[in-house]
Swiss-Prot record:
It comes from Nostoc sp. (strain PCC 7120 / SAG 25.82 / UTEX 2576). The keyword Ribosomal protein applies. Keywords: Ribonucleoprotein, Ribosomal protein. This is Probable small ribosomal subunit protein cS23. Belongs to the chloroplast-specific ribosomal protein cS23 family. The keyword Lipid metabolism does not apply. Probably a ribosomal protein or a ribosome-associated protein. GO terms for molecular function: structural constituent of ribosome. Signal peptide: none annotated. Gene3D superfamilies: 3.30.390.140. HAMAP family: Ribosomal_plastid_cS23 (MF_00619). One of its GO terms (biological process) is translation. Part of the 30S ribosomal subunit. GO terms for cellular component: ribonucleoprotein complex; ribosome.
């Protein structure tokens, strides 16, 4: 997943997911943020990644699997935990937010 970075916006009532592409030594936004549970963020992210035909199936599956893990964690216990704990649990994901 080094070609892409899963970004998470960690909020009290929602979690949002986006993907950036690694370009040189920086990153470039690849998708907008998709919010859960306000919308079906996973399904929206899946459709967005599928529309970018140059993303390999392997990269897409890795991103979606990690998104699933983060959403499940947030639903089951994470929404009541500080963002710092989520960062420790998912060190390969970039977090930002207010929680």
């Amino acid at each position: 997943m080094t070609k892409f970075i899963l970004k998470i916006l960690w909020l009290d009532e929602n979690v949002a997911l986006a993907v950036d592409q690694v370009v040189g030594k920086g990153t470039s936004p690849l998708t907008k943020y998709f919010f859960w549970p306000r919308n079906d963020a996973w399904e929206e992210l899946k459709k967005e990644l599928e529309s970018k035909h140059w993303i390999s199936d392997l990269d897409r599956v890795e991103l979606l699997n990690k998104a699933t893990e983060v959403i499940n964690y947030w639903q089951e216990e994470g929404r009541n935990r500080p963002m710092a704990e989520a960062q420790l649990k998912f060190p390969e994901v970039t977090f930002t937010g207010s929680a």
